[in-house]
């Protein structure tokens, strides 16, 4: 060995040289004297083993096979068993002895035999297979460093080789370590070294055997260490890979679980959504079914309503065509009248009628004054009757005295018997006179109420009175000779004369009443005639305003506004020449002109208590429907013509509320709501007033009359219902309504007298007037009345509803 310290361990022909600061120059095996050189063989064996290890490492790295930690230990046991078998096979004489040079510090291992080399190659290949992954120069499991030796093939032996090398025919590879500083070896020194080696061979054989065993142990330890390091390293890698694999598997499982949970949540949410959608669909289905049913019902209802409207439209078209025809006829009639030039004549007649109206008013006032005088005369007659009653009572007392004196006288004489008879006759006459007095008293009372009431009864009493008076006169003449009855005779004569005077006076009053009634009838007919003539003139201006200019009418007549009531007032208007010979039931008997009485105000007042939607009201509105069509049209025309405002049809609930407000305002209590509702309901159809059948102003007047005729409000009512119509008109139309032809109501005192007189007059009409005609002609169809109703009308109305300005 040289100065530099070097450590060398050898086993199985391997020489491990550890030298600091020197390079490997050559590794030669030490050859015995009688054998071949072992160094080249050993070096070639090492080279082959290293190549095999590298090949195995390359294959293992290419295949990428992963061995478990448990496989390292059987491989280690297999390698140890193969090494022991090789040791048994190798004889002692085949042990190579390594030579070491003191100068170069090179230890040369003698190469083994070829067979051993083959066995060693197999073992080394197996070891290399077990430790292929750890030949990476890492010091984690071993402190040794393996490096690939350089094989040097020398074709010619160098000069400085030993004699044993010269004898060798084959070149041998060897590991070389080159040192930093190299000593030159002379031939003499090499020879000396060989000689010394040969001398020390016997002593080193024992060392060689020991070193070979030691090398085996070292190799075994190295193999064990390498295998343990490989196993440890591979185990750690496998554990890490397993851990990574487990983590990856856990992560995958967690991801799968998350995906599954999210999918389950989505499925659950979709299931809930499906349920809600199903419920919504069911609800929508039910709603669509209900809507479909309602649509079908509505469709059927609309179809029926459409059919009904078509039928009603056809009817209305027919009615409209008929109305248009009637309108054309009326226009033709108006044109005919205009062509004849009757407009100026009508104006003249109207002026004459106004003059007659003034005269009639004066006569009416005189008639009222005469009636007052008659009432005062009736009171005077009542007083005279009281006086006559007192006289009769005095005569009765005298008769009783005379009868008593005659009874106390002689009863057997024949004169007494005759006197008794005369007394009995006088008593009978006295009772008759008393009966007459009581009757006359009753008749005078009736005369105070109404002087026309007892016409037939007074006639009967006149005849009865004449007969009884005749009897009394005959008996008085026969017995006038009697002296004791002279005073009685005088009293009876006075009574007879007074009764005759009373009857005569009463008869004269009855005649005067008849004449007053006739005169009243005449006045009434004349006033109606004047009114008719006036409206006749106004109807001419409705359809053609130019007619007045063409025929020279007055400016006032031309400027009069058109009204819808002209057609209502004259539904059957014709020329006077055409209808002059067709007025049978309504002509007057005194040869005067005809007097049409078709006027709304009078008919309304006469039939206000008997009006019903089925009879009188329809008669009132028969001609009004010619001027308007339908409830709305008639209501608007009436409101425009009377109040200059457009109003919709009056509703029943609104009208009832107005009546209730007025009653609560004017009266403390009103107990006839049910009766009033029954009366009002007759004039409303489906809650709306029948404007096409009756005028609303007429209806208000009917309600007013109905309330006045109640017994509770006939006397001492202080005019509670006087302002009812104004209150109703103010509510519906904004202002009150003033009748265009003067006041339609008398004053309060006159109205009370008229109401009381009308009651008794109705009783008298049952006896005085004949039965009405069963068929009164065509005028009765449109509300015409007979003469009896016309005669009573003035008494009920009091002051006539006319004004001289018209």
From Swiss-Prot:
Main location: membrane
InterPro entries: CCPG1/PBIP1 (IPR051990)
Entry keyword set: Cell cycle, Coiled coil, Membrane, Phosphoprotein, Signal-anchor, Transmembrane, Transmembrane helix
Sections of the chain in a coiled coil: 305-449, 503-529
Phosphoserine: modified positions: 186
Cell compartment(s), UniProt: Cytoplasmic granule membrane
Parts of the chain on the Cytoplasmic side: 1-216
UniProt feature, compositional bias: Basic residues: 175-184, 468-478
The keyword Nucleotide-binding appears for this protein: no
Membrane-spanning ranges: 217-237
Region Disordered, residue ranges: 80-105, 152-207, 457-478, 758-778
Ranges annotated as biased composition (Basic and acidic residues): 190-207, 457-467
One annotated Gene Ontology cellular component of this protein: membrane
Region (Interaction with MCF2L and SRC): 1-307
Topology versus the membrane: Single-pass type II membrane protein
Residues in the Lumenal compartment per record: 238-806
Protein purpose: Acts as an assembly platform for Rho protein signaling complexes. Limits guanine nucleotide exchange activity of MCF2L toward RHOA, which results in an inhibition of both its transcriptional activation ability and its transforming activity. Does not inhibit activity of MCF2L toward CDC42, or activity of MCF2 toward either RHOA or CDC42. May be involved in cell cycle regulation.
Subunit structure: Interacts with MCF2L. May interact with MCF2, ARHGEF1, BCR, VAV1 and FGD1, but not with TIAM1. Interacts with GTP-bound CDC42 and SRC.
Family affiliation: Belongs to the CCPG1 family.
Name this polypeptide is given: Cell cycle progression protein 1
Taxonomic source organism: Pongo abelii (Sumatran orangutan)
